[in-house]
Amino acid sequence: MATMEVEAAAATVLAAPLLSSSAILKLLLFVVTLSYLARALRRPRKSTTKCSSTTCASPPAGVGNPPLPPGPVPWPVVGNLPEMLLNKPAFRWIHQMMREMGTDIACVKLGGVHVVSITCPEIAREVLRKQDANFISRPLTFASETFSGGYRNAVLSPYGDQWKKMRRVLTSEIICPSRHAWLHDKRTDEADNLTRYVYNLATKAATGDVAVDVRHVARHYCGNVIRRLMFNRRYFGEPQADGGPGPMEVLHMDAVFTSLGLLYAFCVSDYLPWLRGLDLDGHEKIVKEANVAVNRLHDTVIDDRWRQWKSGERQEMEDFLDVLITLKDAQGNPLLTIEEVKAQSQDITFAAVDNPSNAVEWALAEMVNNPEVMAKAMEELDRVVGRERLVQESDIPKLNYVKACIREAFRLHPVAPFNVPHVALADTTIAGYRVPKGSHVILSRTGLGRNPRVWDEPLRFYPDRHLATAASDVALTENDLRFISFSTGRRGCIAASLGTAMSVMLFGRLLQGFTWSKPAGVEAVDLSESKSDTFMATPLVLHAEPRLPAHLYPSISI
């Protein structure tokens, strides 16, 4: 079966027109190699080293150089790529392998790259605290190069002068507390628009039995917020009377989420660069199409704004885009080129949309199935905020149970299986294992958050666990890396403060403003996870009934 799958895939690719002779030769060599290895995979393989079931992984005692972390024996040249291709999606294969081996650190070799996966908080802290400086770089991949405009932004660029420059810009000008406060009113406007939009959806039919697509609502709230902060606009196209997205806004979010799903997606040519251009799995084509879709919308706004500032037509700053364009160097010249502005605008957009929307969708799904948890959250909102005004960002410090629900969603249902990879700048040792220079270290979001040696009943949605040891103010960040909400360290998340505000306001407004219930005929919300990612397998659709006085649902401001 494995051989037939490889040969069928090869036949599909060979049907593509206009391949050069050298490309065909490379492809044939690759297919022959895979066919041979696929047959060889039928033979039993020797088991790999297992670690203790009660502690984080540690290597066997001995002398000499430390071993690599446990993992499958790699093949020459291609490493473990054949196993990866036959066990898609790759992240589920890696996690299953680690469970079977009983290890919290593992190594698979993809092409010539050692990929080290970690599911233990102690080892994760060793990477991002003790050795943060050595793991400060990023991999060079087709998707990251494309989405960063040739590594011109901060999040995706490898360690070097360009990353240092763009990171300074973000730290001093974009994610600083003063800038967060400066754009407070825009975030509030979008929270108000969210409230009215859901109200319109919930009341548009006389029967009142209207299903609300929570994923649609949550993602477009996040899209609205980032467009307002970045471009000072909710819409790229015509405003919608009900406050919802139009066709261009739907296209924008679809392209952004497609792009995020393609970043560091275990593409074969990222590990065998000589295959780049053949696009064996279609990855490169989809990356290009998604990037064009995002850039077509962003560039129209950025080009016009650049012209306005250069001509003197624009004089006052209103958003992040104005900040980036008007930055000056020591000589009074523009600090950023227009290409850097475009790359960083996309960077900021990618950083802020997926985590809040995913966490809120999962949390609401879990809570509809667990009325006691829902009741606790509603009681806190009624006690802290009441029903005579809408929840505001100033209420966030007091909404500890609401934040505990979001923390639990981050823990149990992370937005991605792994964090963005960290690349080792030099040979090092982690947890007693050898990690060679150039290795890609990935912290498993699902492995950390669901580690049974760290969490009691790890698969249970139980927000109270975050109140037992927390201080008076529950934070969405997790400093001990028992799970990952927003990444930390020198390559930490650029949108942690913004992401916290967006998550709590999105969740708070949905909970305070509406009573949520399962649609008629549905006994329980299906909490199945998608096979290809960590989102819900099916978008969450619920019945929403307004629970506040009608005058509190603000009118649409477009």
Swiss-Prot record:
It is found in: Endoplasmic reticulum membrane. Its cofactor is heme b. It comes from the Eukaryota. GO terms for molecular function: heme binding; iron ion binding; tyrosine N-monooxygenase activity. GO terms for cellular component: endoplasmic reticulum membrane. CDD domains: CYP79. It holds the Pfam family p450. Its EC number is 1.14.14.36. Its main location: endoplasmic reticulum. GO terms for biological process: dhurrin biosynthetic process. Residues 49-65 have a biased composition (Low complexity). It catalyses: L-tyrosine + 2 reduced [NADPH--hemoprotein reductase] + 2 O2 = (E)-4-hydroxyphenylacetaldehyde oxime + 2 oxidized [NADPH--hemoprotein reductase] + CO2 + 3 H2O + 2 H(+); L-tyrosine + reduced [NADPH--hemoprotein reductase] + O2 = N-hydroxy-L-tyrosine + oxidized [NADPH--hemoprotein reductase] + H2O + 2 H(+); N-hydroxy-L-tyrosine + reduced [NADPH--hemoprotein reductase] + O2 = N,N-dihydroxy-L-tyrosine + oxidized [NADPH--hemoprotein reductase] + H2O + H(+); N,N-dihydroxy-L-tyrosine + H(+) = (E)-4-hydroxyphenylacetaldehyde oxime + CO2 + H2O. Disulfide bonds: none annotated. Keywords: Endoplasmic reticulum, Heme, Iron, Membrane, Metal-binding, Monooxygenase, Oxidoreductase, Transmembrane, Transmembrane helix. Heme b binds at residues 138, 167, 422, 491, 493. Pathway: Secondary metabolite biosynthesis; dhurrin biosynthesis; dhurrin from L-tyrosine: step 1/3. Cytochrome P450 involved in the biosynthesis of the cyanogenic glucoside dhurrin. Catalyzes the conversion of L-tyrosine to p-hydroxyphenylacetaldehyde oxime, via the N-hydroxy-L-tyrosine and N,N-dihydroxy-L-tyrosine intermediates. Produces the (E) isomer of the final oxime product. Belongs to the cytochrome P450 family. This is Tyrosine N-monooxygenase. It comes from Sorghum bicolor (Sorghum). The gene is CYP79A1.
